[in-house]
Amino acid sequence: MVKPTKVTNVIRVLRERAGMTQAELAGRIGVTRQTLIAIEQGRYSPTLELAFQLSRVFGLGIDDVFQYPEG
């Protein structure tokens, strides 16, 4: 069983607000829909490069899209 990552994100909320489907967003950042689903659900941590790409799609900084608990 895959252990969920500690990194959380608001990608699904941002994607839905932007009126994008999972397939559309996945295509814009060059990953499969399945990979995007895993990232949205916290089952997969994206690479730093992919995190930047996702953030830029929404015009936000990485820390606005991804959160890592302190401590």
Language-model region placement:
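A short, Lys/Arg-rich alpha-helix, primarily the initiator
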Residues: 1-17
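Short, charged recognition helix plus adjacent turn
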Residues: 1, 56, 66-71
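DNA major-groove recognition helix of helix-turn-helix/homeodomain DNA-binding modules
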Residues: 49-64
